[in-house]
Amino acid sequence: MMDVGEPMSQLLGRGIRGCALFVALLVAGPLAAQQVVHVGGAFFPPYVVKAEHSQHAGLLPQLLDALNRAQSDFRFIVRPTSIPRRYQDFEAGRIDMSMFENPAWGWQEIAHSVVDMGLEDAEVFVARAEPGRGQGYFKRLRGKRLALFNGYHYGFADFNAEPQFLAKNFDATLTYSHDSNLLMVLHGRADIALATRSYVSDFLESHRQYAGQLLISRRVDQRYRHQVLLRPAAPISAAQLGRLFEQLRRTGQLAAIFAPYRIAVRSGAADSSVTAGVSD
């Protein structure tokens, strides 16, 4: 019942506050209903750049933006991690998924489900271009100084990423910078570096002064058929995520993001991407 003695200004104030609260609830409702999906951001250029900082760059943020715009049930956000720490973060539930992965990269004993992203890249060998040097230079790695990224799993080493193994069996220098590895090759401090084809393409686009100075192998160390690994308790299921990737592929959004980096978008890959998880 209205208090007849209550000033009109107070009544108006109540009404305004009530309307504001109603509008706020209307706006917040859809956001509150969204389930947050934490995606691990481990340094893997050009996919993830500056993952240890609050501002993320690279292709992963572009992909998550496209996923967020494609639906309203989930909100995908990057949570920083690192190459070695991502396993622990995944098992602890700090991250719900890890993208641009391969189950052979140390995930064999960790429960997960797999979604094929429908994207393909390749790890290639890179040397300094010199007169008379051709593709035969990449046939043998023994006796050559290698510049590798610490923590990465390489095919030529049977995916053994242990620094001691690489140092003992290969003349390998391990760093945390792909730029440094390529510069070591360019300046004669290493004979061969390994990097993704997409990264080498991006490096040469950003450092045009090195055009023609690198010899890139036709030999491929490994082909990346990029996959998403989902933890069992993730807010989104493998089937739901697979349908979202198929939607982005069908509408051309995957190609718009990845094709400029020479990352192939495989036709129809997401239709059959959902597979059973690996158990402990």
What are the roles of these predicted feature ranges?
Residues 78-141, 153-156, 218-219:
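Acidic, polar ligand-binding/catalytic clefts
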Residues 41-45, 120-124, 209-245, 265-279:
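Periplasmic-binding protein-like
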Residues 34-110, 174, 251, 260-261, ...:
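Extracytoplasmic small-molecule ligand-binding "clamshell" domains
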Residues 74-75, 153-170, 245-280:
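Ligand-binding clefts/hinges and TM-proximal coupling segments of bilobed small-molecule sensing domains
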Residues 64-72, 116, 142, 150-175, ...:
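Ligand-binding cleft/hinge of the Venus flytrap
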Residues 70, 84-95, 178-199:
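Short helices/loops that flank or line small-molecule/ion binding pockets
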Residues 61-71, 131-132, 138-145, 152, ...:
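Extended ligand-binding regions for polar small-molecule ligands
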